[in-house]
Structures are given as C-alpha cells and as structure tokens.
C-alpha cells in the first residue's frame, strides 16, 4: 500500500498540482471528443484522434503520478536523494511526437521530414530521462546538455523545414501553424530550464514549485495547443490544410 503522503499529497504536497493536471487533461480530452463527435471528414478526424490521444495519455500520466506510481528515488553518489517522477518522460515519449505530427499534418510536411523530426524528438526525451536517472552529477548534466541540444535541433527543424512546408499552405493554415509553432517554441524551451533549476538539477526550486511549473507547461503545450488547432478554420472547415504530395512523401 502506498504511503499517504505519496498516494494523495505527494512528497512535498505537489499532489494538488497533479490532481489539477489530471482534471485539466481530462476536461480537455472530453471537450475534444465532444467537439469531434459528429466529424465525418477523414482528414479532420485524424486531427481529432491525435489531439484526443495526447490529452488522454497526459491525463493517465498525471493520474498515475497522483497515486504515487511513476515516482522513484535516485540516490546520487554524493548522498543526495532526488524524488523523480519518471512517468513524465513516459508521457512525453508519446505525446511530443503526436504534437509534432499534428502540426506537421497542418503544415503539409512530408513523411520523410516528419520521421526525421520525430526521431530527434524521441532521442531528446530518452536522453532527458537518462539525465534524470544518472547517479553521477557530471553525467546528469552531460545528458541534460545532449537532450537540450537535441531539443534545439527539433525547434530548428520545426521552424525551418516544417515552416517551409507551411508556406505553401492556405492563409488560415499558415496563421494557425504560426501560433502553434510559437506555443511549442516557448513552452518546450522552458522545459530544460525547469529541469535545471528544479530538484533534478540545481535544486533552486522544490518539488512543489517544479510540479506546478510542469503542470502549467503541459496544459499549455497540450490542451492549449489542441484548443487552438481544433478551432481553426483550416481544420473545422471553410479552409483546408494541405496534404503531403506523393512526391514529398518519398
């Protein structure tokens, strides 16, 4: 049986943020499902399915963390013990590629470009998890650096390569792409900073504040992202996002 402080309130009372995160993700998922309930167009359905999956996976992750699952202790070689919610990384390993897939479909990016982008993204998440679980501080910061560099590649690829594909899209699709791209650029850039100043890095922010920050970032990058995407005329009608050509998909 899980200790009360882990199963309900968390290690430092951060359970309140995990509960709010769970509710926020569930509400977002229900909203997306209700909005897409009567959608018949296959291309529109694709956006709804992906966005609902993102919210559902995130809700499951937050709920598991609230009940104390996906939480472990990492004892460093210097004796410092860190409480780590590794379930975040399991969440991100699935949801970040889906977010990129959503925006890639909107932009009309080729399958090859999206495969490259998602591969780099997965590498970013895995090396971030490695940084979190390493017991030697130098190794932790080394893998954090590698993960951050990978993130910069992801953001660069999103702006330059996917952005170029979006330039051929309709005006409405371009406008929506620009907003979603900026959400990803700002929110994702904050994640490694949050790691660095939080309990997994320098310890300048406790687990309570760190969990609050991650919750805000997650809700913005997932539910906020989905809300804007699925309200766009490029998705719901009146304008259409491009689809990758057969030549671009090669």
From Swiss-Prot:
The chain crosses the membrane at residues 14-34, 49-69, 89-109, 114-134, 142-162, 183-203, 210-230. The keyword Transmembrane helix applies. The keyword Cell membrane does not apply. Keywords: Chromophore, Hydrogen ion transport, Ion transport, Membrane, Photoreceptor protein, Receptor, Retinal protein, Sensory transduction, Transmembrane, Transmembrane helix, Transport. PROSITE patterns: BACTERIAL_OPSIN_1. GO terms for cellular component: membrane. It is a multi-pass membrane protein. Induction: Expressed constitutively throughout the growth phases, both in presence and absence of white light. One of its GO terms (biological process) is proton transmembrane transport. GO terms for molecular function: monoatomic ion channel activity; photoreceptor activity. The modification N6-(retinylidene)lysine is found at residue 222. It is found in: Membrane. SMART domains: Bac_rhodopsin. CDD domains: 7tm_bacteriorhodopsin. The covalent binding of retinal to the apoprotein, bacterioopsin, generates bacteriorhodopsin. The record marks 91 as: Primary proton acceptor. Light-driven proton pump. Belongs to the archaeal/bacterial/fungal opsin family. This is Bacteriorhodopsin-II. It comes from Haloarcula marismortui (strain ATCC 43049 / DSM 3752 / JCM 8966 / VKM B-1809).
């Amino acid at each position: 049986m899980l200790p009360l402080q882990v199963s309900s309130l968390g290690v430092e009372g951060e359970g309140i943020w995990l509960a709010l995160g769970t509710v926020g993700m569930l509400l977002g998922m229900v909203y997306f499902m209700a909005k897409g309930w009567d959608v018949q167009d296959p291309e529109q359905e694709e956006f709804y399915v992906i966005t609902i999956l993102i919210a559902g996976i995130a809700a499951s992750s937050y709920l598991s963390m609230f009940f104390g699952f996906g939480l472990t202790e990492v004892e460093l070689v210097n004796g410092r013990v860190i409480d780590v919610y590794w379930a975040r990384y399991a969440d991100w390993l699935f949801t970040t590629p889906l977010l990129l897939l959503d925006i890639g479909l909107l932009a009309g990016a080729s399958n090859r470009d999206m495969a490259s982008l998602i591969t780099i993204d997965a590498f970013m998440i895995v090396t971030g998890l490695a940084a979190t679980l390493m017991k030697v501080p130098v190794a932790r910061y080394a893998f954090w650096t590698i993960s951050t560099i990978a993130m910069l590649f992801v953001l660069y690829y999103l702006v330059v390569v996917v952005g170029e594909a979006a330039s051929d899209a309709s005006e409405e699709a371009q406008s929506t792409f620009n907003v979603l791209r900026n959400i990803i650029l700002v929110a994702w850039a904050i994640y490694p900073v949050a790691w660095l100043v939080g309990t997994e890095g320098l310890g300048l922010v406790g687990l309570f504040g760190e969990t609050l920050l991650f919750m805000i970032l997650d809700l913005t990058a997932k539910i906020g992202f989905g809300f804007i995407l699925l309200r766009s005329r490029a998705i719901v009608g009146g304008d259409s996002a491009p689809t990758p050509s057969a030549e671009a998909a090669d």
